[in-house]
Amino acid sequence: MSGTLSQGSSPARLTLWEEENFQGRRCELMSDCSSIRELSGFRRVRSVKVESGAWVGFEYPDFQGQQFILEKGDYPRSTAWSGSSGYRTDQLLSFRPLLCANHSDSRVTLYEGENFQGCKFELSDDYPSLPAMGWASKDVGSLKVTSGAWVGYQYPGFRGYQYVLEQDRHSGEFRKYSEFGTQAHTNQLQSIRRVQH
C-alpha cells in the first residue's frame, strides 16, 4: 500500500541509490520498506532524493536504530541527512513515509515527567533552543503530538539524535522517552521543529 499523505496531496515517493552522488543502482519507494536489502538487493543506501512527501530513514532494517528525517530534496551523501547531528551513519537500510502531512496547525505538548506529569509546555512553532524559550530542563519525560509531525533533537540548534514524533504513531502519545525511537537512550530533548513538506 502506498503511503497516503492527506486529501489532495500526491503520494509519497522516494528514490534511493546504492552509492553517493546518485550513482550505482537505484530503487523507488512509495510505501514502507523494512529492508532495502531484501527489496532491491542493495547492500546499503548512500544517496537519496525525496520526490514528494516526507520520509524517515533508519540506520538498520525493520525501522531500527537512529532515525533521520528526509524532507523534499536531494541528499547526495550521508552528511546531507545527518547534518550537524553529531551522530553519523553512512547508510540507511529501512524507510517509511510520514502520513500526517498537514502541518498548517502543528501542535505538541511537552511534559517534564513520564505519563504526562509535571510541568508542561505547549508548542506550535519551531524552537531551536527549548531552554532559551523557557523550558527549565534539558529533559522531556513524555509528550503529546496533537497534530502534524515534529522532529525533536537531543541538543539545541537541531543537533544530536533525531526523534521523529507523529500524531499518527502511538496515537500521538509518547508516555516515556523510550517511545521517541528505538535509539532513545536519554530523555534529553532540547530543540524541536515541525516537519516540512
From Swiss-Prot:
Molecular function terms, GO-annotated: structural constituent of eye lens
GO BP terms in the entry: lens development in camera-type eye; visual perception
Region described as Connecting peptide: 100-105
Gene3D superfamilies: Crystallins (2.60.20.10)
Domain Beta/gamma crystallin 'Greek key': 12-52, 53-99, 106-147, 148-196
Listed SUPFAM superfamilies: gamma-Crystallin-like
SMART domains on file: XTALbg
PROSITE patterns assigned to the protein according to its UniProt record, in alphabetical order: CRYSTALLIN_BETA_GAMMA
Keywords for this protein: Eye lens protein, Repeat
Region (N-terminal arm): 1-11
Pfam families for this protein: Crystall
Domain remark from Swiss-Prot or TrEMBL: Has a two-domain beta-structure, folded into four very similar Greek key motifs.
Family in the record: Belongs to the beta/gamma-crystallin family.
PANTHER family: BETA-CRYSTALLIN A2 (PTHR11818:SF7), BETA/GAMMA CRYSTALLIN (PTHR11818)
Subunit-structure text: Homo/heterodimer, or complexes of higher-order. The structure of beta-crystallin oligomers seems to be stabilized through interactions between the N-terminal arms.
Function: Crystallins are the dominant structural components of the vertebrate eye lens.
Protein name: Beta-crystallin A2
Protein source organism: Macropus fuliginosus (Western gray kangaroo)
